[in-house]
């Protein structure tokens, strides 16, 4: 998503061989991007920052090689703006013509280019505009004004069974069950189905936070997000979390439902529609459902390589895993809504932050003076 249009754009094809390397020096990076001028760049890079730098370096277009083996091209997003752009962000809505190609096609082009210079022609049709979309939210009141926000995105690529139709169905069942038991709720439960997750860079949840900020800031005690649930081959679970509840909270639940206790958690990312940092929601959790290391089929964030492709179909659903994911998330949100005090463990949280800060500081060059940082933290 997000590309300039191109109508038979012609140019010399240039292979970005340094995209296979890591830890490039500043001089290597400088020479690398200078080589892109007036070229159609074939690369393994796919991030928006890279495409932006390629555009600033004078590249004509970018062709991203999908790293996944097989007949896959994962729909992705090179936009750098979170949500609907403001006027001062308009400059970042200018893009190069950019498209993805299959791994086999990319490797074939690399092989041909080794024999000599090649020209390429690129045609891309793209419509970029602000659209009106609908978002459904169910507000099930509890005995207090505080509530747990539970969410998932309903926009999908193609059929999108595991991303994110299964989660949407689970949320619908939550709404049915919780509404039937609404008289028993200590805190309310608000269930939201976001639009604009992929194509709008979390524009739905961003709009919701902007439009409901005061309520979220005052009353929302937790945000639990469901994404990629019920996916075949996703036998293990790791918690993505902001960490305020302490690792044992999610580890206990994960061990109960999988038999394996994780010894780490993954810091929260924006991909879980985490548009609520500024509203200071105390607890933020999205469980991550993964294959066992020996059964991993790809680097995709799901059970297999079908993520964001037309192959994310009903046969990728595992009903047993779906029920596991529905139960663990329901137990978590029910525990939070019914707790006398929300399960925030500040001593453990600060201990974890201390360890992460020390690890970061220990990796810095000795020329970087950390005295003031350490004094402030201590």
Which residues make up each language-model segment?
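His/Asp/Glu-rich mid-to-C-terminal helical/loop segments that flank catalytic regions of hydrolases
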Residues: 187-190, 293-354
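Extracellular/luminal Protease-associated
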Residues: 1-97, 262
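Second-shell loop/turn segments in exported
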Residues: 1-3, 15, 38-45, 50-51, ...
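Metal-dependent peptidase/peptidase-like ectodomains
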Residues: 106, 143-145, 195-306, 376-378
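Soluble metallo-hydrolase cores and metallopeptidase-like ectodomains found primarily
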Residues: 1-27, 85-162, 172-186
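Structural recognition of the beta-strand scaffold that forms the well-ordered cores
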Residues: 13-16, 40-43, 61-65, 97-101, ...
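Acidic, Ser/Thr-rich low-complexity intrinsically disordered segments
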Residues: 344-378
